[in-house]
UniProtKB/Swiss-Prot annotation:
The lineage of its organism: Archaea, Thermoproteota, Thermoprotei, Desulfurococcales, Desulfurococcaceae. It comes from Aeropyrum pernix (strain ATCC 700893 / DSM 11879 / JCM 9820 / NBRC 100138 / K1). Belongs to the peptidase T1A family. GO terms for molecular function: threonine-type endopeptidase activity. The 20S proteasome core is composed of 14 alpha and 14 beta subunits that assemble into four stacked heptameric rings, resulting in a barrel-shaped structure. The two inner rings, each composed of seven catalytic beta subunits, are sandwiched by two outer rings, each composed of seven alpha subunits. The catalytic chamber with the active sites is on the inside of the barrel. Has a gated structure, the ends of the cylinder being occluded by the N-termini of the alpha-subunits. Is capped at one or both ends by the proteasome regulatory ATPase, PAN. This is Proteasome subunit alpha. It comes from the Archaea. GO terms for biological process: proteasomal protein catabolic process; ubiquitin-dependent protein catabolic process.
Length: 258
């Protein structure tokens, strides 16, 4: 005797290439859920440059958190952070790096930030319309300074879409982060102000799991990663833990008020 399959186990659910009657690709939707479970990453653009920040979590007493990377250099003028499945993110980041090298060799100049985001989004899109593959369960934030000096931040989604933002967050804390961006982001922010805003946001997210404010502040330098690219130098720079701690110490009273 044959039994009907539950609605959540229909063909639309199993195949990445079949639309449901509602117009959904369920596997793509599920890939978005993988992103929402990831550690939070942020991108902020200012007139002085861009800031990339990411959350790192203590996942076990034997794990060396200092060797966990959430922010990567794509080229001198572009950095990237991700949320979702780390292996998927690594593959796409390597693809973006190879693309930028080829672009420099062919055209003698670095590619615009949007072009790098687009080619990665194109790869993601291709994995939503071919059999035998699954969508990438990762979202990426590309932030950088274009050859003409303009600053850009892009988010690429599992379905192949990419969007430009002034400030954006992805991952498990994206709702908290984006609400804080809407309240506190200004287009005339300095790079220093953007860096402090990123730290405030990540502190607020960490406080969701750490009740004691003093402990959250003390562990903040261990649980965040920060990088920036200035319009003047156009050189990807990742901050050391000591540099992050210095900034955290300078804004201690502000953090205690959150």
């Amino acid at each position: 005797m044959a039994f009907p399959m539950p609605p959540h186990q229909t063909a639309y659910d199993r195949a990445a290439t079949i639309f449901s009657p509602e117009g959904d690709l369920y596997q793509v939707r599920y890939a978005f859920e993988a992103v929402k479970k990831g550690w939070t990453s942020l991108g902020i653009k200012t007139n002085e440059g861009v800031v990339i920040a990411a959350e790192k979590r203590f996942i076990g007493p034997l794990v060396d958190i200092d060797d966990i990377d959430k922010i990567y250099k794509i080229d001198d003028h572009i950095g990237v952070a991700f949320a979702g499945m780390g292996g998927d993110g690594r593959i796409l980041i390597d693809y973006a790096r190879v693309f930028t090298v080829r672009h420099r060799l062919l055209y003698g100049e670095p590619p615009p930030v949007e072009l790098v985001a687009k080619v990665v989004a194109d790869v993601k899109q291709a994995y939503t319309q071919h059999g035998g593959v699954r969508p990438f369960g990762v979202a990426l934030i590309f932030a950088g300074v274009n050859p003409d000096g303009t600053t850009k931040v892009y988010r690429t989604d599992p379905g192949g879409q990419y969007f430009s933002f002034k400030a954006i967050a992805i991952g498990s804390g994206e709702q908290v982060a984006n609400e804080m961006f809407e309240k506190h982001y200004r287009s005339d922010m300095s790079l220093e102000e953007a860096t402090k805003l990123a730290l405030k946001i990540l502190y607020a997210i960490i406080r969701k799991t750490v009740e004691d404010k003093e402990k959250a502040i003390a562990t903040l330098p261990d649980q965040v990663e920060l990088a920036y690219i200035t319009v003047k130098e156009r050189m990807f720079t990742k901050m050391t833990k000591e540099q992050v701690k210095e900034i955290v110490d300078s804004m201690r009273e502000e953090l205690l008020q959150l």
